[in-house]
Amino acid sequence: MSFWLPSQGKLYLPPPTAVTQYLDTDDFVTRTDTFYHTNTERLLFVGHPYFDIKREDKVLVPKVSGSQFRVFRLKFPDPNKFSFPDPNVYNSDNQRLVWALRGIEICRGQPLGIGVTGHPSFNKFKDAENNNNKTPDQTTDDRVNMAVDPKQVQMFIVGCTPCDGEHWDVAQACDRLEPGACPPIELKNTIIEDGEMCDTGFGNMNFQKLQASKSGAPLDIVNQIVKYPDFLKMGSDPHGNSMFFYAKREQMYVRHLWSRGGTIGEEIPPNGEASPYYLPGAGRATLPTSVYFGSPSGSLVSSDQQIYNRPFWIQRAQGRNNGICWNNQLFVTAVDSTRGTNFTISVHRDKPSLEDQDTYTAAEFKHYLRHVEEWEVSLVLQLCIVDLTPEALAHINGMDPRIIESWNLGFIHAPNNIEDQYRYLQSIATRCPPKEDAAATEDPYAKYTFWDVDLTERFSMNLDQYSLGRKFLFQIGKKSRGIKRSAPKAVTFESSSRSKKAPKRRRKNV
């Protein structure tokens, strides 16, 4: 006998609306065999490693730390305004030219060194690692002078839009918070700007709002927002503009285990009753603090583990943008804490120079801190052609309409009727002058802080005259146009160890 049974399997239907299809730049961009080299000048930074030195809200000495992000905004010339030797490079009626990144080398100067950061009033109550004695009672102020070496970070992100960062900040509470309650926190995404701090081993959060004691972090981050690149968001970007590729190397270990001083906000549960976490003992009515933390340490720095001072070649980017520099610009976000040495400069309080008979007195000398950085960026760019097809224009317009506006495609406007033209616009006898309709093109990143580097006049087709250019020519199998050298003459030497053979005698016919 047969029975009818309902189907146990699930039926999956496609989504009612079609999924948006994003074009890859290789679908509508044609690459040429024309390459250019460009590089920045030597970019130098000098400042105080912990904070800005101000006088009446004017920055006298800026903050320059080895754990700061450096964001270089490299501006390129418009290739559509170039004069090429071959006039038939592209058809200006239905094509436009753009730059594509093929190679980059980020160079760092200065010797390797470990930076030191700290706080003269650091909230370190008791050693929780090797605690031989019982925990003493807390006093009103148990803060100490403490210094650590930050986490070792080497990282750079390359894209045609700024790098996205993430940090934890105070969130909006559903109900009114009571005094002393822990605020809710949320993950926020913001653009990483030049001079902002990276993670030094204390986390990526807003220390200005989440550290009310001003003693839970070193001086360089205690009043700052520490950010970390949001690789997940940039990796899933449908356009792939913010991150063509990245390279990073992080290293840290916990050097000491300490505990915080103060009142515990959340005690070990349950409060005042038998706890599943510990057994009460005689002579211990109250437990010591359970707020632990570790002091970071970046450990050894070595030239064997460096991502800088070496070229990187882009064959295929991680996203859909395969290295096309839209709007003729490139953003390089970098950080390097392996050259974090802080200079200690000492000067006499009264005398400009000391004499041989002077003696040392500690109070007569003033000590200053300075940190210096040295950067240089070299690029190899490839000239590419964009076909102005409807699909390509629709894709570019949805991504960034400013790109099409900068191309001056020359759309024909509808004819207007005759308009009135007054001669004396500023005269009080006539009407007020009308407002200008065509507003100037605004920079979308004007409110952000970057290091703007103008490379419009630093392009060269002679790649063999530059170090990165010669490396690139070797990669693609082209010989550099150098001076031909004559081949050395071959010289042979006879070995003295070989015995000379006697000449053979001819046999006489008998």
From Swiss-Prot:
A Pfam family matched in the record: Late_protein_L1
Localization: Virion; Host nucleus
Comp. bias (Basic residues): 498-510
Gene Ontology biological process: endocytosis involved in viral entry into host cell; virion attachment to host cell
Gene Ontology cellular-component terms listed: host cell nucleus; T=7 icosahedral viral capsid
Matching InterPro entries: Capsid_L1_Papillomavir (IPR002210), Capsid_L1_sf_Papillomavir (IPR036973), dsDNA_vir_gr_I_capsid (IPR011222)
Assigned keywords, A-Z: Capsid protein, Disulfide bond, Host nucleus, Host-virus interaction, Late protein, T=7 icosahedral capsid protein, Viral attachment to host cell, Viral penetration into host cytoplasm, Virion, Virus endocytosis by host, Virus entry into host cell
Disulfide bond in keyword set: yes
Region (Disordered): 482-510
Segments passing through the bilayer: none
Disulfide bond recorded as keyword: yes
Single GO MF annotation: structural molecule activity
Subunit structure: Self-assembles into homopentamers. The capsid has an icosahedral symmetry and consists of 72 capsomers, with each capsomer being a pentamer of L1. Interacts with the minor capsid protein L2; this interaction is necessary for viral genome encapsidation. Interacts with protein E2; this interaction enhances E2-dependent replication and transcription activation.
Family from the record: Belongs to the papillomaviridae L1 protein family.
Protein role: Forms an icosahedral capsid with a T=7 symmetry and a 50 nm diameter. The capsid is composed of 72 pentamers linked to each other by disulfide bonds and associated with L2 proteins. Binds to heparan sulfate proteoglycans on cell surface of basal layer keratinocytes to provide initial virion attachment. This binding mediates a conformational change in the virus capsid that facilitates efficient infection. The virion enters the host cell via endocytosis. During virus trafficking, L1 protein dissociates from the viral DNA and the genomic DNA is released to the host nucleus.
Name of this chain's protein: Major capsid protein L1
Species lineage: Viruses, Monodnaviria, Shotokuvirae, Cossaviricota, Papovaviricetes
Gene: L1
